[in-house]
From Swiss-Prot:
This is Protein GMH1 homolog. It comes from Schizosaccharomyces pombe (strain 972 / ATCC 24843). Residues 1-54, 110-140, 197-201 are cytoplasmic. GO terms for biological process: meiotic cell cycle. Residues 76-88, 162-175, 223-235 are lumenal. Has a role in meiosis.
Length: 235
C-alpha cells in the first residue's frame, strides 16, 4: 500500500485526531481569529502545507451540527422522518454541499484574480493554493455563523419572529452579523497566503450585506422566512 494511502487511513482514525487543537481553533475563531491563522502559518513551516493535518475539526463540527439539527427537529418537525430530514439537510447540504461549493468558488477566484504574477512564486510548489485549505477556510468562517444561526437563533426565535420592529431588527441583524463575520474570516484566511494579492476584495460583499439588511428592515423578517423554507411553516 502506498504511503499516501497509509496517511489517508491514519487521518481517519479518531485516536490520531487532535481534538484539543480543534477546540482551540473553535474558541479562537470568536475571540482572536488571527491567532488561528498565525498558527497555520507556523504549521506550514513544519509540514509544508496550509491545510489541516487531520479531520478533527470537521468531525467535531459535524457532531455539533447533528445535535443542533436534533434540537431544531424537536421544535419544528418532531417525527422520525423529521429528525432524519433535518439532520440530512443541515449536515450534508448546509455544511457539506454548500461548503464544497464555497471552497471551490473561492479556489477559482483566488487562482484567477488574486494570484501574484511573479514567475518564482508561480513555479514554486511552496506557493500552490490547496483546495483543502480553501475548504478549511470555509469551515473556519462558517463556524461562528453556525453558532449564531443554528444555535443562538433557535432559542431567540420566540422573540425575533414577533410582528414588531424590535424583533425584526434583532433577527435581521443576527443574520447581518453572521454574514459579515463569515466574509471577514474568509478574508483573513486568504490574506495570510504570501502568494495572493488584493485579498481585501474579498470584503466587498460586506457593503452589499448592509444594503440588503437596511432594505429588509422595511418589513422582511429573515428568521421567519428561513424557518418557513426549512420546515414549511412560520415560527
Amino acid at each position: 500500500m502506498s504511503r499516501s494511502f497509509r496517511n489517508g487511513f491514519r487521518l481517519l482514525k479518531l485516536s490520531q485526531m487532535d481534538f484539543e487543537r480543534a477546540w482551540w481553533d473553535m474558541a479562537n475563531l470568536f475571540r482572536a481569529p488571527r491567532r488561528v491563522y498565525r498558527s497555520i502559518t507556523l504549521r506550514k513551516q513544519n509540514i509544508n502545507r496550509y491545510g489541516r493535518e487531520d479531520f478533527s475539526f470537521i468531525v467535531l463540527f459535524s457532531c455539533m451540527i447533528v445535535i443542533s439539527a436534533l434540537l431544531w427537529a424537536l421544535f419544528y418537525m418532531n417525527t422520525p422522518k423529521g429528525y432524519v430530514t433535518t439532520i440530512t439537510f443541515m449536515l450534508f447540504v448546509d455544511f457539506g454541499a454548500v461548503g464544497v461549493i464555497m471552497a471551490t468558488m473561492y479556489y477559482f477566484i483566488a487562482k484567477r484574480f488574486l494570484m501574484k504574477s511573479n514567475d518564482t512564486i508561480l513555479s514554486s510548489t511552496d506557493y500552490q493554493l490547496e483546495w483543502n485549505y480553501c475548504f478549511d477556510v470555509h469551515c473556519n468562517s462558517f463556524f461562528p455563523s453556525f453558532v449564531l444561526l443554528y444555535v443562538i437563533q433557535l432559542f431567540l426565535l420566540p422573540v425575533i419572529t414577533r410582528d414588531n420592529f424590535i424583533s425584526l431588527f434583532m433577527g435581521n441583524t443576527l443574520y447581518l452579523v453572521a454574514l459579515c463575520y463569515y466574509s471577514y474570516l474568509t478574508f483573513i484566511g486568504y490574506q495570510i497566503l504570501p502568494f495572493l494579492k488584493n485579498t481585501h476584495a474579498l470584503l466587498l460583499p460586506i457593503p452589499m450585506f448592509f444594503i440588503m439588511w437596511a432594505l429588509s428592515l422595511l418589513g422582511f423578517n429573515v428568521p421567519k422566512h428561513v424557518v418557513d423554507v426549512y420546515f414549511g411553516k412560520s415560527a
